[in-house]
């Protein structure tokens, strides 16, 4: 029998059969997919073959084959830094929910997510959520960020889940597709899904006034069928996005605005740091590339995993003289 993994709890997997039935399955033995060393060999979105267990009183099954994935998206495992965690597979697009405040989403987090999506060939779209809560300063920050990413070529949406602003536009973009939602805890993923599909009644959280951080309401990634011919994968909130190892010379290729210029650099292996006649540095000095993007690039290049949750939005407009050297 063949089905799609809709939920993974680590040891059990909820599989939807081709007939539309849901079966709780376990994994048979150990899987290794094309040498991928991951903490979770089976991910939400996987197409699997399974057999029903004849000895069980309940309807359960055993997964014995994983079909080839058309794509998947990963990040570094939280506890095992040398391994990867597959967030989801066989997805058409990923939406990253961004909030300016309550909780704040840093540019380094956004850029690490976008670089990973670029590396795995998945379209990424930014959703600026909670626009109804913005004041004059945070609205300025939000519009500035949106300008940066729109200029690069990323689609951006402004949404208020609580006031139902922009939700219909989002639904139009999701029709006929499998979409993954990601972001920090508290950015409003579950609230947004409830706004699109109230019958799901997903649990939502309250932001801590002291830490400005959200509490986890989604424990495991889970796929849902929506009434408007769309499927969504809701993922647990994440604090940081660890980049899986990339070759230094590859990284700039996952920044679209860098990729357009890199052939103009004097050296083919230019890392866009101290090399002479670097097209990226020249564009940076002309403010044709955002300083926040360049700083994110440097942090990834230098393997700065300890501080990838730092930075904030004003660094382009007030870049220090030291940064510009």
UniProtKB/Swiss-Prot annotation:
GO terms for biological process: ribosomal small subunit biogenesis. GO terms for cellular component: cytoplasm. Its cofactor is Zn(2+). It comes from the Bacteria. The gene is rsgA. Its main location: cytoplasm. GTP binds at residues 129-132, 183-191. Zn(2+) binds at residues 265, 270, 272, 278. It is found in: Cytoplasm. Keywords: Cytoplasm, GTP-binding, Hydrolase, Metal-binding, Nucleotide-binding, Ribosome biogenesis, RNA-binding, rRNA-binding, Zinc. Residues 80-241 form the CP-type G domain. Belongs to the TRAFAC class YlqF/YawG GTPase family. RsgA subfamily. Monomer. Associates with 30S ribosomal subunit, binds 16S rRNA. CDD domains: S1_YloQ_GTPase (cd04466), YjeQ_EngC (cd01854). One of its GO terms (molecular function) is rRNA binding. One of several proteins that assist in the late maturation steps of the functional core of the 30S ribosomal subunit. Helps release RbfA from mature subunits. May play a role in the assembly of ribosomal proteins into the subunit. Circularly permuted GTPase that catalyzes slow GTP hydrolysis, GTPase activity is stimulated by the 30S ribosomal subunit. Its EC number is 3.6.1.-. Binds 1 zinc ion per subunit. PROSITE patterns: ENGC_GTPASE (PS50936), G_CP (PS51721). InterPro entries: G_CP_dom, NA-bd_OB-fold, P-loop_NTPase, Ribosome_biogen_GTPase_RsgA, RsgA_GTPase_dom, RsgA_N. It comes from Flavobacterium johnsoniae (strain ATCC 17061 / DSM 2064 / JCM 8514 / BCRC 14874 / CCUG 350202 / NBRC 14942 / NCIMB 11054 / UW101). This is Small ribosomal subunit biogenesis GTPase RsgA.
């Amino acid at each position: 029998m063949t089905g799609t993994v809709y939920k993974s709890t680590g040891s059990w997997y909820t599989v939807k059969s081709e007939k539309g039935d849901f079966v709780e399955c376990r994994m048979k033995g150990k899987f290794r997919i094309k040498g991928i060393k991951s903490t979770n060999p089976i991910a939400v979105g996987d197409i699997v073959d399974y057999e029903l267990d004849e000895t069980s009183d309940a309807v359960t099954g055993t997964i014995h084959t994983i079909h080839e994935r058309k794509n998947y998206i990963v990040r570094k495992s939280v506890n095992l830094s040398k391994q990867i965690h597959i967030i989801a597979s066989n997805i058409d697009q990923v939406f990253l929910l961004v909030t300016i405040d309550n909780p704040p989403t840093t540019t380094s987090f956004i850029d690490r997510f976008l670089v990973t999506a670029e590396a795995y060939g998945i379209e990424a779209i930014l959703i600026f959520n909670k626009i109804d809560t913005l004041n004059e300063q945070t609205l300025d920050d939000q519009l500035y960020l949106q300008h940066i990413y729109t200029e690069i070529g990323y689609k951006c949406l402004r949404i208020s889940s609580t006031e139902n602003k922009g939700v219909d536009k989002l639904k139009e973009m999701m029709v006929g597709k499998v979409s993954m939602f990601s972001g920090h805890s508290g950015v409003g993923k579950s609230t947004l899904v409830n706004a699109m599909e109230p019958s799901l009644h997903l649990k939502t959280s309250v932001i801590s006034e002291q830490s400005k951080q959200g509490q986890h309401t989604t424990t495991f990634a889970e796929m849902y069928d929506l009434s408007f011919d769309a499927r969504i994968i809701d993922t647990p909130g994440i604090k940081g996005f660890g980049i899986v190892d990339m070759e230094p010379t590859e990284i700039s290729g996952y920044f679209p605005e860098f990729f357009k210029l890199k052939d103009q650099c004097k050296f083919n292996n230019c890392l866009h740091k101290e090399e002479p006649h670097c097209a990226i540095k020249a564009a940076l000095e002309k403010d044709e590339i955002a300083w926040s993007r360049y700083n994110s690039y440097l942090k990834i290049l230098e393997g700065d995993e300890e501080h990838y949750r730092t930075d904030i939005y004003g660094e382009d407009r007030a870049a220090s003289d030291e940064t510009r050297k």
